[in-house]
């Protein structure tokens, strides 16, 4: 998986 910023609300 690519490195991405994951934000969980």
Curated annotation (Swiss-Prot):
Documented EC number(s): 1.97.1.12
Domain 4Fe-4S ferredoxin-type intervals: 2-9
GO cellular component, one term: photosystem I
Cofactor: binding comment: Binds 2 [4Fe-4S] clusters. Cluster 2 is most probably the spectroscopically characterized electron acceptor FA and cluster 1 is most probably FB.
Top-level taxon: Bacteria
Entry keyword set: 4Fe-4S, Electron transport, Iron, Iron-sulfur, Membrane, Metal-binding, Oxidoreductase, Photosynthesis, Photosystem I, Repeat, Thylakoid, Transport
A GO molecular-function annotation: oxidoreductase activity
Top-level class of the enzyme under EC nomenclature: oxidoreductase
Membrane topology: Peripheral membrane protein
Example of a GO biological process term: photosynthesis
Catalytic activity, reaction form: reduced [plastocyanin] + hnu + oxidized [2Fe-2S]-[ferredoxin] = oxidized [plastocyanin] + reduced [2Fe-2S]-[ferredoxin]
Cell compartments where the protein resides: Cellular thylakoid membrane
Biological role stated in the UniProt entry: Apoprotein for the two 4Fe-4S centers FA and FB of photosystem I (PSI); essential for photochemical activity. FB is the terminal electron acceptor of PSI, donating electrons to ferredoxin. The C-terminus interacts with PsaA/B/D and helps assemble the protein into the PSI complex. Required for binding of PsaD and PsaE to PSI. PSI is a plastocyanin/cytochrome c6-ferredoxin oxidoreductase, converting photonic excitation into a charge separation, which transfers an electron from the donor P700 chlorophyll pair to the spectroscopically characterized acceptors A0, A1, FX, FA and FB in turn.
Protein name: Photosystem I iron-sulfur center
Source organism (scientific name): Anabaena sp. (strain L31)
Gene of this entry: psaC
